[in-house]
Structures are given as structure tokens and as C-alpha cells.
């Protein structure tokens, strides 16, 4: 019987690749998707569809009540515009949800302990390091230190693409034969991707770097 692993799966291309990576490694993934009140709720719908198609264990957990305590992010507050441009720009800090990955990983670790799983996979990568403190190698290292002492059972947090950028993730996923039309990246909660937010810009750059056209629909195309 293969080992169980909890995969934090948003529905985006990074976690989509991580999910398949776990399966390729012969692990049994338990996908965990969080509704934290994000305006790009479409990613949850995509995650459900993918997991159903793959026959993967999947839970969608509503933690949107945290927004009674945590605010100031354009991802959860519709009164704040989602910044346009590249992630390296200072304006992209408006997309930071305070303490998000610490909260999500804490819940995922608890789920892993309950399942008897020894690892939690999540899709942090080098393109996130500039803006998101909770995607940096030092954060993963320190969270692993905490995870090692928080329970009787040790759970490792593993980010297979921590030192890869999005184009590298895409390259690996393409080598696995993955279909990225089954992913959602845009931070704006509209029917088509905007093509202008940091998440869209980075995604489009990744496809361009791999000499490909992005298979999802954009508003300006």
C-alpha cells in the first residue's frame, strides 16, 4: 500500500503540478483545498473537477471566517483592487493574505497526523519569494522545525519546486504530459483570466519561456 501524503491544492498550476508529482512518485494524495474567502473562487471549482476526474481524495474546507480577524489583502477584500504587473513590483504586496500559509499548513499538518501521513506537499516556488514571506525557504525550514515538535507524530512539509520558478514547474509538468487547461491562476474573480494581475503575468511568462501558448481563455484575446 502506497504512502499517504496531504497536498495543499488550490486549483492553480503550481499545486496542480505538485499533485501530479506526488502521484508520479507512487504516493496516495489527499488533496486539501481551502476557501478562505478569496475572490478567485473559480480555482476551487477547478480543483473539484480535477480531483473528481483523477479519483483523488479531496476535501474543500471553508475557513472564510478568518476574514473577521485578517484583512488588508486584495485577494479577500473586494474593495481593494488587485494590482497589475509583475510580482517583483512593490504594489504586489497588496495580494499578501497575512499568515495565510502558516494557517493552511497548520491545518494540513493536523489532517496529515489524523490520516497517518508523514508529509504535506505545497506549491511554493522561487517566483513567490520576492513578495510572499510564507513561500520562502526560511519559512519552510522553520515550519518544519515547528511541525517536528507540535505533535507526537512528525510531519514533514515538502515543497518540491521551492527553488524553481514557474517556467521550471511548467516544464516539469509538460514532461509529465499534464493539461494546464485544467488549472486556474487569475486573482480576479471573473469568467476569463485578466492577463494583467501578477499571477497571470507570471503564468503567461512561463508559457512563453516554454515556447507555448497558454490554453486558458483571457479577456483580451
From Swiss-Prot:
Cofactor(s) listed: Zn(2+)
Pfam families the UniProt entry points to: QueC
InterPro entries according to UniProt: QueC (IPR018317), Rossmann-like_a/b/a_fold (IPR014729)
Annotated positions binding Zn(2+): 186, 194, 197, 200
Catalytic activity: 7-carboxy-7-deazaguanine + NH4(+) + ATP = 7-cyano-7-deazaguanine + ADP + phosphate + H2O + H(+)
GO MF terms held by the record: ATP binding; ligase activity, forming carbon-nitrogen bonds; zinc ion binding
EC code(s) of this entry: 6.3.4.20
Amino-acid positions noted as binding ATP in the UniProt annotation, renumbered to this chain: 9-19
The keyword Membrane is annotated on this UniProt entry: no
Enzyme class: ligase
Binding note for cofactor: Binds 1 zinc ion per subunit.
Biological process annotations from GO: queuosine biosynthetic process
Record's keyword terms, sorted: ATP-binding, Ligase, Metal-binding, Nucleotide-binding, Queuosine biosynthesis, Zinc
Record keyword Zinc present: yes
Database matches in Gene3D superfamilies: HUPs (3.40.50.620)
Pathway the protein takes part in: Purine metabolism; 7-cyano-7-deazaguanine biosynthesis
The protein's role, per its UniProt record: Catalyzes the ATP-dependent conversion of 7-carboxy-7-deazaguanine (CDG) to 7-cyano-7-deazaguanine (preQ(0)).
NCBIfam families noted in UniProt: 7-cyano-7-deazaguanine synthase QueC
Similarity remark: Belongs to the QueC family.
Name of the molecule in the record: 7-cyano-7-deazaguanine synthase
Species this chain originates from: Psychromonas ingrahamii (strain DSM 17664 / CCUG 51855 / 37)
Gene: queC
